[in-house]
Amino acid sequence: MPLHNLTRFPRLEFIGAPTPLEYLPRFSDYLGREIFIKRDDVTPMAMGGNKLRKLEFLAADALREGADTLITAGAIQSNHVRQTAAVAAKLGLHCVALLENPIGTTAENYLTNGNRLLLDLFNTQIEMCDALTDPNAQLEELATRVEAQGFRPYVIPVGGSNALGALGYVESALEIAQQCEGAVNISSVVVASGSAGTHAGLAVGLEHLMPESELIGVTVSRSVADQLPKVVNLQQAIAKELELTASAEILLWDDYFAPGYGVPNDEGMEAVKLLARLEGILLDPVYTGKAMAGLIGGISQKRFKDEGPILFIHTGGAPALFAYHPHV
């Protein structure tokens, strides 16, 4: 078993049972292709989402180090920050979040609703900054201040996307392979590619478990030129942690993130509405809507390697729908 080293890393069991892997019959009929969906939007805590897989490893490491405070950063409507705050609440830890307003909006829904509303419910200490220009350095500076106040902070990077956190999606690849075995031969997998941990973890896991399946990352914030080194560097860091090789080519499409991170676009919003109306499943305007737009466009433009079944990784994000009203 090529991924046996995963068991060496401490991990908290937040998720428990595997998340569903479902066939989408009406959406498949609409697109003329078999489409499956991995429902990481329904992980158990705080309205679900993919970051919980990373936090199983990161929070375990925080407890191992004796931390009493989790510190992380993201946009005002960050799904990662929301899930980190929920984990902190569950574990009886303090949570400090460094937030930016990446789209420069004054819209009340964005500033106070959706994920931001949930941060208050989880009693998160909020620190605002003009921009996360160097988030690692900014988080370390914040940790120094928090430590000076007598706390024992543990820094979680943006998106939980370091080699340790990304192990959550190596684990997810194992789960996907087990669910597909004897049921469906997935030809292509599509995932939103942002802070890169989910994409890189899947890349390492699927290379060893489902090597015939191509993995497409649809970028949500950067061009291929900017995103590729982030994913590749993390892919190699994960492989080093697991003491295995990672040589799979990283495939990225950057046609769907414009005009920028956190700003809805027409293709993404069309995808959100389409899946809601055909399958009753909620995507979001920031990540999964744009990734699904990539899947839809990839089929119409014949960009996939063949016409076999496609698996979409639903990473969550539905709370942002309320923050982006009236765009939705």
Swiss-Prot record:
Pfam families listed in its UniProt record: PALP
UniProt-listed NCBIfam families: ACC_deam_rel, PRK03910.1-1, PRK03910.1-3, PRK03910.1-5
Keyword Lyase: yes
Transmembrane annotation, as ranges: none
GO biological process: D-amino acid metabolic process
CDD domains associated with the record: ACCD (cd06449)
Function: Catalyzes the alpha,beta-elimination reaction of D-cysteine and of several D-cysteine derivatives. It could be a defense mechanism against D-cysteine.
Top EC class, one word: lyase
Enzyme Commission number(s) from the entry: 4.4.1.15
Stored InterPro entries: ACCD_DCysDesulf (IPR027278), D-Cys_desShydrase (IPR005966), D_Cys_desulphydr_bac (IPR023702), TrpB-like_PALP (IPR001926), TrpB-like_PALP_sf (IPR036052)
Name this polypeptide is given: D-cysteine desulfhydrase
UniProt modified residues of type N6-(pyridoxal phosphate)lysine: K51
Protein origin, superkingdom: Bacteria
Coiled-coil zones: none
GO MF annotations, alphabetized: D-cysteine desulfhydrase activity
Protein transport recorded as keyword: no
